[in-house]
Amino acid sequence: MIVGTGHIGSYIAYRLAKLGYKVCVFERRSRIGEATCCTGIIGKECFDRFPIVNNGVLIQASSAKFFSPSGKCLRLSKDTVQAYIVDRAGFDRALAQKAQEQGADYRLSARVHNINSRDNCVRVTVEHKGEAIDFEGRMAVISSGFGTSLTQRLGLGKIADFILGAQAEVNVRGLDEVEVYLGQGIAPGFFGWLVPTSAGKALAGLLSRRSPGSHLKNLLSSLLAQGKITSTETRIIHGGIPLSPLPKTYRDRVVVVGDAAGQVKPTTGGGVYYGLLCADIAAEVIYGALRSDDFSAKRMSYYERDWKRKLSRELQIGYWARKTYESLDDRQIEKIFDIIQANNIHEDVLQSPDFSFDWHGDSILRALKNKPLARMFGR
């Protein structure tokens, strides 16, 4: 049994249903892919590793512009495609359809209130049309995104550090690449974005500790004044994004995967690829448990051991970088721009064999080998 029909839940459902297991997926909303606060930027490595996710591509991306608080522009560009921009709602729906084609059963408008692990099964209590219904199965996967209360009820703790995001679809003029905006007056401690999705359309958004909606309205007003968008009248979607992992992501008969587990890049808040990598690990561990009929906490611990081996270094370096950037004021951000441009650090990082759209740790450490930049951070 799987809680959540996002890309994580549907990918695990697809993997297990394809192996012939009976899978039931619960979703509290009435439609799959509703109210997704995500830019839909997915790295090429993710597409190459998971061909099943190659759905709903809107645009290929090989460059991005970064703007300092004063408006200085730093353009990063590669000769090859680095990422794809997808329709996230359509992306989630396509994955769910693939899982259903393999036999997975999807229950919509079904809110999971409780998960109870027993010796011989796991019981899930679901509210559907005002009625509480119990379902029993051999395993449960929590992949319902950030903010679920199920993990605390199961004694797995809660995510300690998180941010808030706000995003809206806007009409644009002549936007052909991703733009990122830095500065305390735009997104304090974080960043804003303008991401093209189709002809004349884009997603504008930002991350912030507090009041992301208010900050986004200010950003939209600025973009309108610059002539980049045609109106500020739009519907704003909000969402929470974890910056740190869940203290524990397993127990007997239960694993937690994706945003619900905090498997997200602390640098950007992106969780599609890391979540899928962990979903792959979870599917393998669950398959082994089903074959051996061993759903003990010890068996489930292999999942946490393996995903941490894969991601811990990236999450630790990324979190350090995130907290360091969050402490900077606009003057310091401007100085970093100046140092990067004067020393051509961005080109050095881009041309390095260590450079990756999805793996930021090596690029961060490489950039810090530059002495003027290292001195800024006391290294």
Regions found by a protein language model. Give the residues of each.
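N-terminal Rossmann-fold NAD(P) dinucleotide-binding loop
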Residues: 9-10
